């Protein structure tokens, strides 16, 4: 898009430019294997595999669906995108939503984080409760 994109504000659960030590390590490893930056599909796959691994560990290797679901409820961990919890009621992800603005950093246009909202639950399910 070029400089016309400067100032555009977006909202997402992930951008490879998110500033954290864990994300920097994730981006470096991802680039080494795939020769490109990760996106929200990449981080979703990474976190999904983390959840499966942790649930299997918690069940002692039991692969029964009910045991794995019970193990996943309420699970929390630090992801490259930030803190994540699995809602014990809905089993949905509770996560930070980041607001980014396109800025020129050196000679690159990057999404620079300008704000965030922590512990965001599925807004539709939250409204349906009331």
What is each model feature region?
Residues 1-130:
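Extracytosolic ligand-binding ectodomains
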């Amino acid at each position: 898009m070029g400089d016309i994109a400067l100032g555009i504000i977006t909202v997402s659960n992930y951008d490879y430019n998110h500033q954290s030590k864990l994300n920097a390590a994730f981006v470096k490893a991802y680039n080494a294997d795939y020769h490109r930056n990760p996106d929200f599909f990449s981080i979703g796959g990474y976190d999904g595999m983390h959840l499966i691994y942790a649930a299997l560990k918690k069940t002692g290797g039991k692969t029964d669906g009910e045991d794995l679901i019970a193990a996943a409820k309420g699970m929390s961990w630090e992801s490259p995108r930030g803190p994540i919890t699995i809602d014990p009621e809905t089993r949905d992800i509770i996560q930070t939503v980041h607001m980014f603005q396109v800025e020129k950093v050196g000679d690159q246009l990057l999404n620079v984080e300008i704000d965030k909202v922590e512990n965001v639950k599925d807004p539709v399910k939250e409204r349906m409760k009331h």
